[in-house]
Amino acid sequence: VLVDPATGRERLGPPPEPADLAWLERWWPLSPGRRAEIGRTRDEAWASVLGRLTRGRAIAVDYAHPVDNRPPCGTLCGYRDGTLVPPIPDGSCDITAHVALDSCAATAPAGRTVTRLTTQREALRALGLTGARPPIELAHTAPREYLRALARAGEEAELIDPTGLGGFGWLCHDIG
């Protein structure tokens, strides 16, 4: 699909390159009338990042979707001032698409990487975030501390909510 940058009007373009068709076949199998965002160049960029790391952890975080549950109409969308708008590439909005983190995961160099796909909820809970409210007794003995702890609990709960930010996919590659 080609998009007019001024109007957002779409029209069919030429067939994808063979490498992009191969990526689609493996990572986003399509039936007629469906659409996808080709992630081959993103996967190549991620592989390049991993190839430069000699030791450490590379983390990618995104809404994500697995190969067995790709959205039938793609995920391309636009945002302006935090509001969802049509993805017209005229510079008036940010344009984004969800990442096929499973395809990125497959780019890891064999033998020198530990790869994990998880959710933000699970990753942050493993780091000790719980979103648990402080004991109510603290409100009586140390009200300011209670309010700080309550605010922190609310922030943590937002980060790990599985229907919100906690549903983000996390791809972690440990190298070295």
Task: Label the model's feature ranges.
Residues 1-14, 55-63:
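Conserved beta-strand signature within the Rossmann-like core of class I S-adenosyl-L-methionine
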Residues 18-176:
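Long, Lys/Arg- and hydrophobic-enriched amphipathic alpha-helices
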